[in-house]
Amino acid sequence: MRYQNMFETLKKQDKMAFIPFVTLGDPNYEWSFEIIKTLIDSGVSALELGFAFSDPVADGVTIQASHLRALKHASMAKNFQLLRALRDYNPHIPIGLLAYANLIFSYGVDGFYAQIKECGVDSVLIADMPLIEKELVIKSAQKHQIKQIFIASPNASVKDLEQVATHSQGYIYTLARSGVTGASHTLKNDASAIIKTLKTFSSTPALLGFGISKKEHITNAKGMGADGVICGSALVKIIEENLNNENAMLEKIKGFIGGMIF
């Protein structure tokens, strides 16, 4: 219900959802908690939180570096502990996870979904799992009331987009471009055709990701019919550039979010 409540509230206000992405434990768990609390307090719509992985193939250099920083001290147990603390901090904000398949399958699919439900997580997006393999996780997601998110890519066929729209819950992660994550100066591709196709099959909100780094990108995304955006690399870059000064990092994050959503 958290996603539904969030989107309904935003619709009444004629606002776009703004969802930041950061990697759990980057640059360490203490700072990570403060970073994510700052995001919540700055008024973001929801959270997209990554589990650090040694081979993050869907990510560009900025987010790859954040995985490597977090991996120095990351563990599944610490991730779950941090998620619980975040849910205790804010009982209402939707929390989504972005993970790579190997982490989930190594842990055990059903055990993973049971654990994240207990932590107060709302959704999971598996970055490197094609839609054709959805049956491997969908039963566990439904059993534990976790919304499974799927990716709509620019190269997907209409049939694939129908499958994505039909099976995605919470929202649909719509790629602004193909390739890997990374901040862009401009949104070069027009995703309006993909979003229009998705909306013919489902009323599930479509969020645009990959390359969102400026306020104008949010305006562009709205013009394409998107219901919101996911912003990762531009935010993670702020973390990377302020590793020696936590206060400066948090102030810059606050300023960045304020400039994007108000």
UniProtKB/Swiss-Prot annotation:
It is an enzyme of class 4 (lyase). The active site is at E48, D59. It catalyses: (1S,2R)-1-C-(indol-3-yl)glycerol 3-phosphate + L-serine = D-glyceraldehyde 3-phosphate + L-tryptophan + H2O. One of its GO terms (cellular component) is cytosol. Gene3D superfamilies: Aldolase class I. InterPro entries: Aldolase_TIM (IPR013785), RibuloseP-bd_barrel (IPR011060), Trp_synthase_alpha_AS (IPR018204), Trp_synthase_suA (IPR002028). GO terms for molecular function: tryptophan synthase activity. Pathway: Amino-acid biosynthesis; L-tryptophan biosynthesis; L-tryptophan from chorismate: step 5/5. Its EC number is 4.2.1.20. SUPFAM superfamilies: Ribulose-phoshate binding barrel. CDD domains: Tryptophan_synthase_alpha (cd04724). Keywords: Amino-acid biosynthesis, Aromatic amino acid biosynthesis, Lyase, Tryptophan biosynthesis. Tetramer of two alpha and two beta chains. Belongs to the TrpA family. The alpha subunit is responsible for the aldol cleavage of indoleglycerol phosphate to indole and glyceraldehyde 3-phosphate. PANTHER family: TRYPTOPHAN SYNTHASE ALPHA CHAIN, CHLOROPLASTIC (PTHR43406:SF1), TRYPTOPHAN SYNTHASE, ALPHA CHAIN (PTHR43406). This is Tryptophan synthase alpha chain. It comes from Helicobacter pylori (strain HPAG1). The lineage of its organism: Bacteria, Pseudomonadati, Campylobacterota, Epsilonproteobacteria, Campylobacterales.
